[in-house]
Amino acid sequence: MFLRDLIKKGVATISAAYPEREAREMVFAYLDRALGTQRHTHIIEPDYEVCEKDAEKSIIDFGRMAAFEPLQYIMGQADFYGRTFKVNPSVLIPRPETELLCRETLQRIASSFGNRKNSDLKIVDLCTGSGCIAWTMALECPGAEVLAVDISD
């Protein structure tokens, strides 16, 4: 199947649930992740051949998106603070607002600790879910002790 045909099919499927413009953006975001294409690929290579297996999976996933399943759950990953984290329906999808919380926390740590070593720093992330906050704090504050806690059934 040609990429342009897959895009048309995806937009038609998802437009049943979302405005067409938003559906088109969702299709492009999906294809960029699933096929490794980039925005310009959709424009300059409309005859790009998508293998049958990828086309079939994409069509199924477009149906899931039309049923309001978040793209992050379909792809099994979400971006947060410049990193990619695994997600599934048992954890909340990391939000941009939470990135702001991390940025503010890191700024406060920098102003409070100054040049002191992060080894004096202890961070606890309760109800960690995907672990994106704990991992971000650990990676941005080398030497800090980070504890992430959650429960699961």
Identify the residue ranges that each predicted region occupies.
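SAM-dependent Rossmann-like transferase core, predominantly class I methyltransferases
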Residues: 46, 50, 56, 60-142, ...
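N-terminal auxiliary segments of SAM/dcSAM-dependent transferases
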Residues: 1-75
